[in-house]
Amino acid sequence: MEIKSNEEWTNWIEKAVAGDKEALERIVLNLQDMVFNLSLRMLGTFPDAEDAAQDILLKVITHLATFRGESAFTTWVFRIATNHLVHYKKHMFAQMPLSFEYYGADIENARLDEVPDLTQNVERSILAEELKMSCTNVLLQCLDAESRCIFVLGTMFKLDSRIAGEILDMTPEAYRKRLSRIRRKVADFLSAYCGEYGEGQCHCMKRVDYAIQSHRLNPAALDYTTATEITPEQMRQFKNAMEEIDDLSARFAFCKTYQSPERTRQFFREFLASASLSAVTNA
């Protein structure tokens, strides 16, 4: 059962805080996909996104009693999630930071013709699509964490500037200005280097073997290909408004959304089955 309105959220929250385990489970089920997808965009890999999503959802359910209804519940959750993700230091790219300069040099200097066929009998088109999905999230790691968050909220989640500004504690005007600058930066890079959307030399199909050789793509472990997609309609309950986007950075809006992995779902099934509700609601 999907929770679609603030009134419904309030009803389930009141029940959960009062000790209703079913209500708490309903809240987690309705949040976990949104939290996982936000984590994936911010951190760039499925394993890191899984770990962060678990941390965020635990923060949410252990602080439910502090929600005062001064904003929409989903806005409150986004605020917790973005604050956690902006300061998250345990993910891969926190240890190996990227830049647009590094990414561009890698594209320019890769000797694709010298790499043998490494596809391991997996269709090249499938691997190219996997690489495309992975690249869109990894490319975002070239932005600093706050800029990445601004871009993700505005371009992928399409949040209204008033809501996004509230989440990030900035005015709508300041948010729009920063989002515009960040979009232009991403669009300029895509235009210069990406052959899928711009005039650049990088094409996913041609880069598959190089990506496998450099351990950026594993034919035996295709996270995006094997993930279960969810429909845009299922994510729409988290969006308060839509914004028009008119540059190449809008291409990131095509990114698919996914169900949180089964490991995360199982973690919370076991947690909710074993945890004392008093420990949760009184934390």
Task: Write out the residue ranges for each language-model feature.
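Sigma70-family region 2
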Residues: V17-A18, M42-T45, L57-A72, H91-F93
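Structural recognition of an alpha-helix C-terminal capping motif at a helix-to-coil junction
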Residues: N37, D51-L58, S71-N83
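Arg/Lys-rich amphipathic alpha helix in sigma70-family domain 2
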Residues: A65-G69, T82-F100, D188
